[in-house]
Curated annotation (Swiss-Prot):
A zinc finger (RING-type) spans 101-143. It comes from Homo sapiens (Human). Keywords: Metal-binding, Zinc, Zinc-finger. SUPFAM superfamilies: Concanavalin A-like lectins/glucanases, RING/U-box. PANTHER family: E3 UBIQUITIN-PROTEIN LIGASE TRIM. GO terms for molecular function: ubiquitin protein ligase activity; zinc ion binding. GO terms for cellular component: cytoplasm. One of its GO terms (biological process) is innate immune response. This is Ret finger protein-like 2. Residues 168-362 form the B30.2/SPRY domain. Seems to be expressed in prostate and less abundantly in adult brain, fetal liver, and fetal kidney. The gene is RFPL2. Pfam families: PRY, RDM, SPRY, zf-C3HC4_4.
């Protein structure tokens, strides 16, 4: 079905508004057909080589941030295989992501399109300067350089961001953790063979905290020897998987997934480039996703129980407040070329915080496990 058949003007922003309404109302087929194409067109508006008013042709050099036709076809094929409920969440997240500034993480205000196709708020432009008062801007997403005199105001994206902001309450409701995700919950345990020697693990392999005394464990190739972290089991190669971690009163933690092949020796750096897709709590309440650079996150309340949903087919990993169901963050383009493992790192601040990370029992198990207490160790 073409947009013209419904009597709507065939412009990227009007298509996206129609898609957004379709997502909110539950009409998936129509929304799925247009949403990726619409958002890519809007993001490209104002990039050199495209007429920001009448469209026109792109230059023969496609900006690296813009999806190619092959990329769009692949995303569309993946969406076709999803259930309506899952697609609705994916589409809502895509709209929210497309209308957010990668610098300040807020809704775009007076968005400016860089040469690579990314858009940032006008007020955030100066923060991308490579040098003080310089003319070169370094994109925080693509690491490509744009000249100040080449950036353009993206008015279509500005109108769309304003429209999405008005519908934020409905989008938030869609992005809440769907209870049906729990049908993919896994009976996860901690892999003691990967645990740093300063970690204390409960006998049931479900709770972990940092200790001050080094444990006498066997020196194994899979063990983290410097960074205080641990992996979970099982390993994931396909399918969808959900688990929850009780972070309690911990003041610092890292949770997520990583490639099975990540380096275990020496001090590790948690970045997506090195195979870690994690959310971190630092400085008594600062939440961030370990992108490059960091993506700072804002939640309505302190997280105490974190839900993690891994979709190997869609190459996504999403984080939720498992108590309220609120969406926290979604990593996209998560590598599925090798097995992924759950990743946990409890707090190790100088004040000796005894924060415990506990894997929550399966919702239908009817049992609970006490977290490890000070003095207990494996």
């Amino acid at each position: 079905m073409e947009v013209a058949e419904l009597g709507f003007p065939e412009t990227a922003v009007s298509q996206s508004r129609i898609c957004l309404c379709a997502v909110l109302c539950g009409h998936w087929d129509f929304a799925d057909m247009m949403v990726i194409r619409s958002l890519s067109l809007i993001r490209l508006e104002g990039v050199e080589g495209r007429d920001p008013v009448g469209g026109g042709n792109l230059t023969n050099k496609r900006p690296s941030c813009a999806p190619s036709p092959q990329d769009l076809s692949a995303q569309w094929k993946q969406l076709e295989d999803r259930g309506a409920s899952s697609r609705r969440v994916d589409m809502a997240a895509l709209f929210q992501e497309a209308s957010s500034c990668p610098v300040c993480s807020d809704y775009l205000e007076k968005p400016m399109s860089l040469e690579c196709g990314c858009a940032v708020c006008l007020k955030c432009i100066n923060s991308l300067q490579k040098e003080p008062h310089g003319e070169d801007l370094l994109c925080c997403c693509s690491s490509m350089v744009s000249r100040k005199n080449k950036i353009r105001r993206n008015r279509q994206l500005e109108r769309l961001a304003s429209h999405i902001k008005e519908l934020e309450p409905k989008l938030k409701k869609i992005l809440q953790m769907n209870p049906r995700m729990r049908k993919f919950q896994v009976d996860m345990t901690l892999d003691a063979n990967t645990a740093n020697n300063f970690l204390l693990i409960s006998d049931d392999l479900r709770s972990v905290r940092s200790g001050r005394i080094r444990q006498n464990r066997q020196d194994l190739a899979e063990r983290f020897d410097v960074s205080v972290c641990i992996l979970g089991s099982p390993r994931f190669t396909c399918g969808r998987h959900c688990w929850e971690v009780d972070v309690g009163t911990s003041t610092e933690w890292d949770l997520g997934v990583c490639r099975e092949s990540v380096h275990r020796k020496g001090r590790i750096q948690l970045t997506t480039e090195l195979g870690f897709w994690t959310v971190s709590l630092r400085d008594g309440g600062r939440l961030s996703a370990t992108t490059v650079p960091l993506t700072f996150l804002f939640v309505d309340r302190k997280l105490q129980r974190v839900g993690i949903f891994l979709d190997m087919g869609m190459q996504n990993v999403s984080f939720f407040d498992a108590e309220s169901g609120s969406h926290v963050y979604t990593f996209r383009s998560v590598s599925a070329e090798e097995p992924l493992r759950p990743f946990l790192a409890p707090s190790v601040p100088p004040n000796g915080d005894q924060g415990v990370l506990s894997i929550c029992p399966l919702m239908n198990s009817g049992t609970t496990d006490a977290p490890v207490r000070p003095g207990e160790a494996k």
